[in-house]
């Protein structure tokens, strides 16, 4: 399959010109603004527990919390510290300005997503993409993938996505400019993923460490390898020590990383069931929720030819995560779409910089991106946590006559809850997207959107216009760079 004619990856000088700075600021502001349009934060169970740790630290200087729902997070939450610590400034500022620490928590998710889109843009430029293509891919990430939905939630996965994208970006910068400051930045970004989730030791830190060693060895003539390894590894060691200390505090043993209650079922899902569920199932399949990844897969061959180390890293990250979570009993993450695959969404879009030049592929990519944006807009209009799950789960229980061993049909039963989730994952009639379309046709819309739909509709249209203007501005900037001196951009 032929690739676009311009495909050389030179050493692109990503300079802080006024035009580039304006473009980056515009991208960040647009993603942040649209993310804040919903003005809501659906905490979910995970988010509630992580927020409770934040609240306990702020009010009582303690890590202990209460879990009235499942009692699985008492007296300590089994989630990572990363999100809870990052929520502290929002809680403190909210308490200071409004007297309510929860008020400004709504800023956290959109801010993380906007930062991720910005870092993704810089990574794409560092890999040689033109400004216009980098803007387009960053906007697809922000509004055509699950990132939009998860910007209105409190989960650890968006933070991991930011960390892994930033780490790859800074390691790639180090390839061009072998100064240890970039290794330190990459190490800090990787350490953030460790603080957010323990599984990042295997799923994120290990592949990134191999990639970092590769970059350091390549630059050994200009920078001592041992010093470089120490610079990258020091933040990881600090994060690992913090996690081990937190485990000792919670469980009295640094070798215990969770509680028995948190492991209900553990790695019991048949591997092929989990893989089908994560990738293709009607209720939680990645391709169903993010169809533009099909175009990314088509582009992978060209990307592998032009950036083999990054392509191998991407495939390693994906393979590890798929194999790990395909066996997990709650592989779907009990949320909208495959939550556990969210951390890789930014980097999975990177191969699009090598999108083949055939017209039908370009048109197909545009259509897939538009479908993805439509899916995300549907997720905003008919939210999963406040509308879809509360109406669909009871319907599943009554239709399929689900009950636990004691005969209870209550969704407060772990067995009934899991069985309802499984039905929504694999039965297209109960799949979230099917139900969202049905509910939308019945006139069921999120109250905040129903009450302010003219204004929000106008703001969305304005955001779309700004996105087009950003792309056109980036396109003009690329031509300016081209005539000033070719850099091998894509």
Question: Over which residues does each language-model region extend?
Answer:
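Perimembrane helix-loop-helix junctions
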Residues: 173-178, 203-240, 297-307, 350
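Transmembrane-helix motifs of polytopic, lipid-linked glycan transferases
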Residues: 104-128, 162, 166
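Short hydrophobic alpha-helices at membrane interfaces in multi-pass membrane enzymes
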Residues: 135, 173-191, 226-227
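Membrane-interface transmembrane helices that cradle and orient dolichyl/undecaprenyl
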Residues: 128, 157, 167-183, 219, ...
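Hydrophobic, aromatic-rich transmembrane alpha-helices
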Residues: 218, 287-312, 348-355, 362-370, ...
């Amino acid at each position: 399959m032929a690739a676009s004619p311009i495909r050389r990856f030179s050493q692109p000088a990503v300079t802080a010109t006024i035009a580039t700075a304006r473009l980056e600021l515009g991208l960040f502001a647009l993603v942040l603004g649209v993310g804040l349009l919903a003005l809501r934060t659906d905490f979910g169970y995970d988010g509630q527990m992580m927020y409770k740790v934040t609240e306990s630290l702020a009010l009582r200087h303690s890590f202990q919390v209460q879990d009235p729902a499942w009692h699985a997070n008492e007296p300590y939450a089994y989630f990572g510290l990363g999100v809870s610590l990052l929520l502290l400034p929002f809680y403190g500022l909210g308490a200071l300005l409004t007297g309510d620490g929860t008020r400004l928590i709504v800023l956290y998710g959109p801010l993380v997503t906007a930062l991720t889109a910005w870092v993704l843009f810089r990574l794409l430029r560092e890999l040689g993409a033109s400004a216009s293509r980098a803007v387009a891919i960053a906007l697809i990430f922000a509004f055509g993938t699950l990132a939009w939905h998860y910007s209105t939630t409190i989960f650890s996965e968006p933070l991991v996505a930011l960390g892994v994208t930033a780490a790859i970006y800074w390691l790639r910068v180090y390839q061009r400019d072998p100064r240890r400051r970039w290794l330190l930045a990459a190490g800090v970004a990787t350490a953030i993923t460790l603080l957010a989730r323990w599984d990042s030791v295997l799923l994120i830190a290990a592949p990134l460490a191999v990639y970092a060693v590769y970059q350091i060895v390549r630059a050994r003539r200009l920078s001592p390898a041992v010093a470089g390894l120490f610079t990258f590894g020091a933040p990881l060691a600090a994060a690992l020590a913090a996690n081990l200390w937190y485990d000792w505090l919670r469980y009295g043993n640094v070798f215990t990383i969770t509680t028995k209650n948190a492991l209900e079922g553990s790695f019991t899902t048949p591997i092929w069931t989990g893989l089908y569920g994560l990738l293709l199932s009607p209720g939680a399949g990645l391709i169903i929720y993010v169809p533009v990844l099909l175009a990314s897969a088509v582009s992978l061959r060209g990307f592998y030819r032009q950036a083999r180390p990054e392509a191998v890293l991407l495939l390693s990250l994906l393979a590890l995560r798929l194999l790990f979570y395909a066996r997990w009993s709650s592989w779907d993450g009990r949320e909208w779409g495959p939550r556990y695959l969210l951390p890789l969404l930014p980097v999975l879009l990177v191969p699009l910089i090598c999108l083949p030049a055939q017209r039908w592929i370009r048109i197909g990519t545009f259509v897939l991106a538009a479908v993805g944006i439509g899916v995300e807009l549907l997720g905003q209009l008919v939210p999963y946590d406040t509308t879809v799950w509360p109406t669909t789960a009871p319907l599943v229980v009554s239709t399929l006559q689900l009950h636990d061993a004691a005969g209870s049909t209550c969704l407060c039963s772990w067995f009934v809850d899991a069985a309802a989730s499984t039905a929504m994952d694999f039965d297209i009639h109960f799949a979230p997207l099917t139900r969202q379309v049905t509910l939308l046709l019945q006139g069921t819309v999120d109250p905040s959107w129903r009450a302010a739909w003219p204004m929000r509709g106008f703001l969305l249209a304005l955001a779309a216009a700004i996105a087009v203007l950003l792309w056109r501005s980036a396109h003009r900037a690329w031509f300016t760079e081209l005539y000033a001196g070719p850099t091998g951009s894509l």
